[in-house]
Amino acid sequence: MGWLFGAPRLVEEKDALKGGPHPVLPNPQPHAVLGTLRGQPGTETIYIGIGCYWGAEKLFWETPGVVYTSVGFAGGITPNPTYRETCTGRTNHTEIVEVVYDPTQVTFDELVVKAMEAHDPTQGYRQGNDTGTQYRSAIYTAGPNAEQQAQRAREIVEHYAPKLAAAGLGRITTEILPLASTPAGEYYMAEDEHQQYLHKNPLGYCPHHSTGVACGIPEA
């Protein structure tokens, strides 16, 4: 475990779990709330980590312009990780919401701002009482504009940093990269029982760790 004997930390590749040869969810079902499928034409995708993915996914499936969401893992080493494997801290993945959106209805900037305002991006390897590298803050971009979008996300985060500092909060630790530049280079969907979890389990665990500090969208 990456934090068994001290503070959470990422593990070296030689110590990471080996994972599996096949996806844990090879045939995703239609979205339980939106009724949609992955891979819709005319859409774009952003991968967002803001702590426990159950509540985070609900936040985004309720966002106008978002046409599909799923939960899974990215940013780490282990291929095709299970939820239990990721919870050991030995995959280096973080919990992620895949957000597929119609860019004519909601913008990339708006989704980044929503993500930043919905959690505390200064907490490092935790969110509230949820501790571990799998809860770290992250934004991963994808598609032909991934590099430009990653740079734009950094600009938004840099715009937010002094506002958080003025509120007495620390340095932003959000990891921002094109998904293809992460160690595994992929997003791995979690098991079906985790998809749209709070729709299936309305009384399920749903922490919110917003700082209450507005971010806003800086000029491009």
UniProtKB/Swiss-Prot annotation:
SUPFAM superfamilies assigned to the protein according to its UniProt record, in alphabetical order: Peptide methionine sulfoxide reductase
Keywords of the record: Oxidoreductase
EC number: 1.8.4.11
Keyword Cytoplasm annotated: no
Gene Ontology terms for molecular function: L-methionine-(S)-S-oxide reductase activity; peptide-methionine (S)-S-oxide reductase activity
Any one Pfam family match given in the protein's UniProt record, by short name: PMSR
One of the GO biological process terms: protein modification process
Catalyzed reactions: L-methionyl-[protein] + [thioredoxin]-disulfide + H2O = L-methionyl-(S)-S-oxide-[protein] + [thioredoxin]-dithiol; [thioredoxin]-disulfide + L-methionine + H2O = L-methionine (S)-S-oxide + [thioredoxin]-dithiol
Active site per database record: 52
Top enzyme category: oxidoreductase
Gene Ontology cellular component list: cytoplasm
Job description of the protein: Has an important function as a repair enzyme for proteins that have been inactivated by oxidation. Catalyzes the reversible oxidation-reduction of methionine sulfoxide in proteins to methionine.
UniProt similarity note: Belongs to the MsrA Met sulfoxide reductase family.
Record-linked PANTHER family: MITOCHONDRIAL PEPTIDE METHIONINE SULFOXIDE REDUCTASE (PTHR42799:SF2)
Name of protein: Peptide methionine sulfoxide reductase MsrA
Gene name as annotated: msrA
